[in-house]
């Protein structure tokens, strides 16, 4: 892969991250599930640090993957947008939310793509969110709370919530 960062003004920057990949996956249990995938993923973002301890990231995500699965060829393309915002809560914590919307198309009418294709985004339109709250209550106690949602062809309105409390001795 390759990553380029261009600082723009004092409080913002552009970042372009391109990853090239080539996978060959075999299954010992089901040999017909052998799949070969090659392609690239591009993540182009603009980050700005605002006053009042807020960071905002806006970006364009895209990728192309070609290969074969079940003996059939596929050619998948995806393009979308993403945003990420971080609120710093004094010196004690932060709230971070990322939202990604992408549309994936495939030229050979594959109904379901392998999970390695296009960073795991499903065929069609996908909306994913990830929110995380991290907060240090005092010097010996903190908590983390994660909320994830996925709405796509595979997972209709899926919501996961995970939390933890940590004690430091």
PLM features: what roles do these ranges have?
Residues 1-169:
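Exposed, low-structure sequence patches enriched in small/polar residues
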């Amino acid at each position: 892969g390759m990553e380029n960062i261009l600082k723009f003004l004092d409080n913002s920057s552009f970042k372009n991250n391109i990853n090239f990949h080539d996978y060959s996956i075999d299954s010992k249990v089901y040999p017909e599930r052998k799949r070969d995938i090659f392609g690239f993923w591009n993540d182009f973002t603009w980050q700005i640090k605002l006053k009042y301890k807020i960071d905002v990231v806006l970006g364009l995500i895209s990728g192309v993957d070609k290969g074969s699965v079940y003996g059939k060829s596929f050619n998948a393309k995806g393009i979308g947008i993403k945003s990420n915002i971080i609120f710093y809560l004094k010196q004690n914590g932060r709230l971070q939310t990322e939202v990604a919307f992408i549309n994936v198309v495939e030229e050979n009418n594959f109904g379901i793509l392998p999970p390695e294709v296009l960073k795991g985004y499903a065929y069609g339109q996908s909306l994913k969110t990830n929110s995380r709250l991290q907060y240090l209550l005092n010097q010996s106690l903190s908590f983390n709370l994660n909320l994830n949602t996925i709405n796509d062809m595979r997972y209709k309105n899926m919501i996961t919530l995970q939390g933890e409390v940590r004690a430091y001795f």
